[in-house]
C-alpha cells in the first residue's frame, strides 16, 4: 500500500480506448507513443473501455479477444505495467457505481447536445439505447474516480471532457471540494494522423474503408499495399512538399514519415526532391513496416503468455480499485448513502 500512496504524489494522468477494433497507427503515433515516453513523469492509468463498447452490439467472444489483444498491444507499444496501471474497465465495479451517481447530476439537455450521441444514433438507428445516451456520464466517472490532473483528449472527446468539468463544478458546488478539476492534456508532440483514403478525416479503427487505416498487427505486405494506394493529391506538381491546405494527402504522408523517422519536413522535402510520389509512398510504407515490426512481434509473444497477461490485468485492477474506492466512499458519504 505504501507504493500506492507514493505514486499518488505524482501528477495523475488517465485515458482509455475502446477495444472495438485493432489499434491503428494513428492511435500509436497520436497517443500511445507519447504516453509511453511520459511514464516517469506521471502516475498513469490506462484502461480498456469494454463497458463503453457495448453501447453498440458486440460479438461477445470477439470483444473478449480484442480486449486482451489491445492490452498486449499497449504493453508492446512501451506501456510498462511496472510503471503504468493497465486495467480492464469492467474489472473495476466502481466505474459503474460512480457512473450511476453522476447520471443523477448530469442534465438531460447536456446529454442531448453531445454530437457523438447524434452521430452514433444516426449510424445505429436500430439500437439507440440508454447507454449510448448516458455514455458521457460513465466517461466522467472513468475520469473522476482517479482524481487525475490531466486527461489526454482527441478532437472527438473534447465535448465529453467539457461536460465532465461541468459535472465537477455542479457536484462540488453542492457538496464541497470532492472532485479535482481535470485539465485536458494536449501534448507538445504527437502526430495527428489522417485516413490514407480520405486525408480530411482522422485515421480510425471504425473507418468503413479498410484501405484508410493501418493497424498495428497488420501484415507488412498489406501495409505496403495500402501506402502505395494512399491518396496523394490531384495537382500536376507531383512533388513532395508540406502544404496541408492544398496538398492534404501528401502532408499526411509526410506527417507519418516524420513521426516514424524523426526527420523534419524540410529534410523529407530534400530527400525526395525530384523523385515524386512514386518513390515517396513506398518509402513511407517501408518506414512504417519497420516501426511496427517489433511491436507486432512483441504483442504476439505477450498474447501467447496468458498467465503473464492475466497477472497484468489483475494487478492493474487491484491498484485501480484501491484508488477508485477511496473516491467512491467520499462520494457516497456526501450524497447521503449509509456506509457499507
Question: Residue ranges of each PLM-predicted region?
Answer:
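Short alpha-helical patches at coil-to-helix transitions and adjacent helical residues
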Residues: 28, 95, 157-161, 250
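N-terminal Rossmann-like or analogous alpha/beta NTP/dinucleotide-binding catalytic cores
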Residues: 2-141, 287, 300
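Internal, conserved structured core segments that host functional sites
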Residues: 119-171, 175, 195
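Conserved nucleotide- and phosphate/pyrophosphate-binding catalytic cores
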Residues: 159, 165-340
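A generic secondary-structure signal for well-formed alpha-helical elements
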Residues: 71, 78, 106-109, 148, ...
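Short helix-capping/linker segments at secondary-structure and domain boundaries
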Residues: 108-112, 145-152, 258-268, 296
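Short, solvent-exposed beta-strand edge segments and adjacent coil->beta transition regions
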Residues: 14, 20, 148, 209-211
Amino acid at each position: 500500500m505504501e507504493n500506492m500512496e507514493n505514486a499518488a504524489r505524482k501528477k495523475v494522468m488517465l485515458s482509455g480506448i475502446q477495444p472495438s477494433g485493432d489499434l491503428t497507427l494513428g492511435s500509436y503515433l497520436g497517443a500511445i507513443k507519447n504516453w509511453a515516453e511520459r511514464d516517469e513523469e506521471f502516475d498513469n492509468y490506462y484502461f480498456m473501455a469494454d463497458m463503453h463498447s457495448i453501447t453498440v452490439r458486440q460479438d461477445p467472444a470477439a470483444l473478449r479477444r480484442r480486449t486482451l489483444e489491445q492490452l498486449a498491444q499497449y504493453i508492446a507499444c512501451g506501456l510498462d505495467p511496472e510503471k503504468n496501471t493497465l486495467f480492464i474497465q469492467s474489472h473495476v465495479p466502481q466505474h459503474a457505481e460512480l457512473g450511476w451517481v453522476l447520471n443523477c447530476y448530469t442534465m438531460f439537455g447536456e446529454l442531448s447536445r453531445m454530437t457523438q450521441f447524434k452521430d452514433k444514433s444516426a449510424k445505429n438507428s436500430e439500437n439507440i439505447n440508454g447507454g449510448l445516451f448516458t455514455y458521457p456520464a460513465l466517461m466522467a466517472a472513468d475520469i473522476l474516480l482517479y482524481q487525475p490532473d490531466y486527461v489526454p483528449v482527441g478532437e472527438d472527446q473534447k465535448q465529453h471532457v467539457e461536460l465532465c468539468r461541468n459535472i465537477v463544478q455542479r457536484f462540488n458546488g453542492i457538496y464541497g471540494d470532492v472532485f479535482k478539476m481535470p485539465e485536458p492534456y494536449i501534448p507538445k508532440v504527437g502526430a495527428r494522423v489522417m485516413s490514407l483514403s480520405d486525408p480530411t478525416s482522422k485515421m480510425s479503427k471504425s473507418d468503413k474503408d479498410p484501405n484508410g487505416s493501418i493497424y498495428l498487427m497488420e501484415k507488412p505486405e498489406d501495409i505496403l499495399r495500402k501506402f502505395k494506394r494512399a491518396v496523394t493529391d490531384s495537382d500536376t506538381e507531383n512533388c513532395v512538399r508540406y502544404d496541408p491546405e492544398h496538398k492534404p494527402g501528401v502532408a499526411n504522408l509526410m506527417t507519418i514519415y516524420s513521426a516514424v523517422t524523426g526527420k523534419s519536413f524540410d529534410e523529407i522535402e530534400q530527400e525526395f526532391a525530384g523523385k515524386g510520389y512514386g518513390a515517396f509512398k513506398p518509402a513511407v510504407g517501408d518506414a512504417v513496416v519497420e516501426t511496427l515490426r517489433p511491436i507486432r512481434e512483441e504483442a504476439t509473444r505477450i498474447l501467447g503468455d496468458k498467465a503473464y497477461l492475466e497477472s497484468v490485468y489483475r494487478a492493474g485492477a487491484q491498484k485501480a480499485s484501491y484508488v477508485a474506492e477511496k473516491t467512491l466512499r467520499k462520494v457516497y458519504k456526501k450524497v447521503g448513502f449509509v456506509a457499507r
